[in-house]
């Protein structure tokens, strides 16, 4: 890890003792996991004390099912996702079994969050040429609530509206929290992992009523998507092997 990154991590750990600081290898990406009660205070300190003057992006994340190597779906065979996982014994995992999650380097298990919904903010410090990812988990899965950052970075207004619209995360203190992508009569939040892939209703223009109407979904066939799989990317291993081979040849 670069000395500059280590120094910055030490500064963050010293300034925010209740915040978890993690560094993703090999790129040295730094992430702060901030408790919900300290979300605004920590972000304000990052802006004022660490010169993170710009918030480039904010999004919501639904961790439902995260860490499960595979899970039961409908209308697929037991061999349907065999390219994504490797069994620990002869044969495949039986449906309903949830093997332990993989790892990012083959030694440590992935950290599976206890809470379902999180908010991620990506910050930039132009003065120090530095980027930082800040994450906050909502404590209530049924009604996820996180404080709004509009008083810290006013430009986050529409980002928070998007996260509210797509994930149902409520940003407390937001001046105008309403849907931004879906229409006003939309029911549910389409980026949640338990939202049906076909949707609930479809919209069309009714010639007789001379207006847009909602009708049950009829034009989309049910389908099964490929599940999120946590595994090592073989491309990086192959690239490392080729690099070692080239040095040996030289």
Swiss-Prot record:
NCBIfam families: PRK06074.1-1, PRK06074.1-4. One of its GO terms (molecular function) is quinone binding. This is NADH-quinone oxidoreductase subunit C. Signal peptide: none annotated. InterPro entries: NADH_DH_suC, NADH_quin_OxRdtase_su_C/D-like, NADH_UbQ_OxRdtase_30kDa_su, NADH_UbQ_OxRdtase_CS. The keyword Iron does not apply. It is a peripheral membrane protein. The gene is nuoC. GO terms for cellular component: plasma membrane. PANTHER family: NADH DEHYDROGENASE [UBIQUINONE] IRON-SULFUR PROTEIN 3, MITOCHONDRIAL, NADH DEHYDROGENASE UBIQUINONE IRON-SULFUR PROTEIN 3. Its main location: membrane. Keywords: Cell inner membrane, Cell membrane, Membrane, NAD, Quinone, Translocase, Transport, Ubiquinone. It is an enzyme of class 7 (translocase). It catalyses: a quinone + NADH + 5 H(+)(in) = a quinol + NAD(+) + 4 H(+)(out). NDH-1 shuttles electrons from NADH, via FMN and iron-sulfur (Fe-S) centers, to quinones in the respiratory chain. The immediate electron acceptor for the enzyme in this species is believed to be ubiquinone. Couples the redox reaction to proton translocation (for every two electrons transferred, four hydrogen ions are translocated across the cytoplasmic membrane), and thus conserves the redox energy in a proton gradient. Belongs to the complex I 30 kDa subunit family. NDH-1 is composed of 14 different subunits. Subunits NuoB, C, D, E, F, and G constitute the peripheral sector of the complex. It is found in: Cell inner membrane. It comes from Xylella fastidiosa (strain 9a5c).
């Amino acid at each position: 890890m670069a000395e500059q990154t280590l120094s910055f991590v030490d500064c963050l750990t010293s300034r925010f003792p209740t915040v978890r600081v993690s560094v993703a290898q090999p790129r040295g990406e730094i992430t702060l996991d901030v408790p919900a009660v300290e979300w605004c205070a920590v972000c304000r300190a990052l802006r004022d004390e660490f010169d993170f003057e710009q918030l480039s992006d904010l999004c919501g994340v639904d961790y439902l099912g995260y860490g499960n190597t595979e899970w039961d779906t409908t209308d697929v065979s037991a061999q349907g996702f065999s390219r994504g996982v490797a069994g620990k014994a002869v044969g495949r995992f039986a449906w309903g079994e949830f093997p332990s999650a993989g790892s990012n380097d083959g030694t440590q298990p992935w950290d599976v969050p206890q809470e379902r919904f999180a908010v991620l903010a990506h910050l930039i410090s132009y003065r120090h040429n530095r980027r930082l990812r800040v994450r906050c988990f909502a404590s209530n899965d049924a009604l996820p609530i996180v404080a709004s950052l509009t008083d810290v970075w006013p430009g986050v207004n529409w980002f928070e509206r998007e996260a509210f619209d797509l994930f149902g995360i409520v940003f407390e203190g937001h001046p105008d929290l309403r849907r931004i992508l879906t229409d006003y009569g939309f029911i549910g939040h389409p980026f949640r992992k338990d939202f049906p892939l076909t949707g609930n209703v479809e919209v069309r223009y009714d010639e007789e009523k001379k207006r847009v109407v909602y009708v049950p979904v009829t034009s989309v066939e049910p389908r099964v998507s490929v599940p999120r799989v946590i595994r090592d990317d073989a491309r990086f291993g192959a690239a490392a092997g080729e690099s070692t081979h080239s040095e040996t040849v030289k």
